[in-house]
């Protein structure tokens, strides 16, 4: 008897208040890395009505203009008029920045602390995941939830749907049979809009101009339920409608709930923070395992102690889809991937101003050149070593 279930993932637009905060934090990080690649950055942002607050611990020789960075991000997203509740020209920007703790720094700096290699910036556990249910080796629900949000921004910015505003959310429910996605069951889109447009206009335009062009037709052969702005009205939105904070969309940023999450957010953190760099490395490892054909699905957990370079643990789960035993895959990972922080940074070339692009529409499953952790350059070596 077939095993059937529904699985749901959500995404949010670049204009969602939490994503505005993420993009400002990563905008600060990129501005600093462009001048000082060895900087230590932990940048948190809060956005509310007419206000941006930037805080955190930053040690750098660079001199970022926090106000200019924040305003540029807000402008690029599309908050350019006080009529929509947030305007880059008039929002206040407050910055309260401290230096990184010297106690932490000595454990991370190479040649200092008890471990003379570059240690992990904190303790913690991180997960990477890949599945062969999409060409990008991402779970299908989160992959297409992101594509819906990217399409919303595209038709908003190019003028096809000029009544759209920046804040939006999507949610995709997919039917699975025996672990494979077979049909889209429900699509939810809530999008901010001008007050003049009717709900009927919004529904028709969102379905025809945003949803249908991006979802795979072969998964929409049955009856799909569309829920468009189900409250009936979404005029007040963005930072005016909800306070936004860095790091509050960690499931949107990763696998949409299809895999575990260690709890650490990404945006605003330089790659000495394993919350970010080791999660990217975990995706790199898992994607190469699946690309090599060693498993249909692969989840990798890696854990660190602060100030210690080598991971304290490494675990693999292929959910019964492995072509070889999971412990053998662990052995292959240890042989082919160096998961010490310095090695991750070097392998994935992470000391570059590449992070603003990651701060909306997911950190994984993207084919832009900045996303080095999406490479499958180890797949052939893994397959050969596995004897497949």
From Swiss-Prot:
GO biological process: one-carbon metabolic process; S-adenosylmethionine biosynthetic process
Disulphide-bridged cysteine pairs: none
The keyword Magnesium is assigned to this record: yes
Pathway: Amino-acid biosynthesis; S-adenosyl-L-methionine biosynthesis; S-adenosyl-L-methionine from L-methionine: step 1/1
Cofactor comment text: Binds 2 divalent ions per subunit. Binds 1 potassium ion per subunit.
Binding positions (Mg(2+)): 18
CDD domains with a match to the protein in the record: S-AdoMet_synt
GO-annotated cellular components: cytoplasm
Region (Flexible loop): 100-110
Protein location: Cytoplasm
A Pfam family it matches: S-AdoMet_synt_M
UniProt binding sites for L-methionine: 57, 100, 242, 273
EC number: 2.5.1.6
Example of a GO MF term: methionine adenosyltransferase activity
Necessary cofactors: Mg(2+); K(+)
Keyword Electron transport in annotation: no
PROSITE patterns (UniProt xref): ADOMET_SYNTHASE_1, ADOMET_SYNTHASE_2
Reactions catalysed according to its record: L-methionine + ATP + H2O = S-adenosyl-L-methionine + phosphate + diphosphate
Residues holding K(+): 44
Residues that bind ATP: 16, 167-169, 233-234, 242, 248-249, 265, 269
HAMAP family xref list: S_AdoMet_synth1 (MF_00086)
Entry similarity comment: Belongs to the AdoMet synthase family.
Role summary: Catalyzes the formation of S-adenosylmethionine (AdoMet) from methionine and ATP. The overall synthetic reaction is composed of two sequential steps, AdoMet formation and the subsequent tripolyphosphate hydrolysis which occurs prior to release of AdoMet from the enzyme.
Protein name: S-adenosylmethionine synthase
Organism: Azoarcus sp. (strain BH72)
């Amino acid at each position: 008897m077939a095993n059937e279930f529904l699985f749901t993932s959500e995404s949010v637009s670049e204009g969602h208040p939490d994503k505005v905060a993420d993009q400002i934090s990563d905008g600060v990080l990129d501005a600093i890395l462009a001048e000082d690649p060895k900087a230590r950055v932990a940048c948190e942002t809060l956005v509310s009505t007419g206000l941006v607050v930037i805080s955190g611990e930053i040690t750098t020789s660079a001199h970022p203009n926090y106000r200019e960075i924040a305003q540029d991000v807000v402008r690029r997203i599309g908050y350019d008029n006080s009529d929509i509740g947030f305007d880059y020209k008039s929002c206040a920007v407050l910055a309260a920045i401290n230096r990184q703790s010297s106690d932490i720094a000595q454990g991370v700096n190479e040649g200092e602390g008890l471990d003379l290699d570059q240690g992990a910036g904190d303790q913690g556990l991180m997960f990477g995941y890949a599945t062969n249910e999409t060409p990008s080796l991402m779970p299908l629900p989160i992959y297409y939830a992101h594509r819906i949000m990217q399409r919303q921004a595209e038709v908003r910015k190019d003028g096809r749907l000029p009544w759209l505003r920046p804040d939006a959310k999507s949610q995709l429910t997919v039917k699975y049979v025996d672990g494979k996605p077979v049909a889209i069951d429900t699509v939810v889109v809530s999008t901010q809009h001008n007050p003049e447009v009717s709900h009927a206009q919004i529904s028709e335009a969102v379905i025809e101009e945003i949803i249908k062009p991006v979802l795979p037709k072969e998964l929409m052969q049955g009856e799909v339920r569309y829920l468009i702005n189900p409250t009936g009205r979404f005029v007040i939105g963005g930072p005016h409608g909800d306070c936004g904070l860095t790091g509050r969309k960690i499931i949107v940023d990763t696998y949409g709930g299809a895999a575990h999450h260690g709890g650490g957010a990404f945006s605003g953190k330089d790659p000495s923070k394993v919350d970010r760099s080791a999660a990217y490395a975990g995706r790199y490892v898992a994607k190469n395992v699946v690309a090599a054909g060693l498993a249909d699905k692969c989840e990798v957990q890696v854990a660190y102690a602060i100030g210690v370079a080598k991971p304290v643990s490494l675990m693999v789960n292929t959910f019964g889809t492995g072509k070889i035993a999971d412990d053998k895959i662990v052995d292959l990972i240890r042989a082919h991937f160096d998961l010490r922080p310095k090695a991750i940074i070097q392998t994935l070339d992470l000391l570059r101003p590449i992070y603003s692009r990651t701060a909306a529409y997911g950190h994984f499953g993207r084919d832009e050149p900045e996303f080095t952790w999406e490479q499958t350059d180890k797949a052939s070596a893994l397959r050969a070593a596995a004897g497949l």
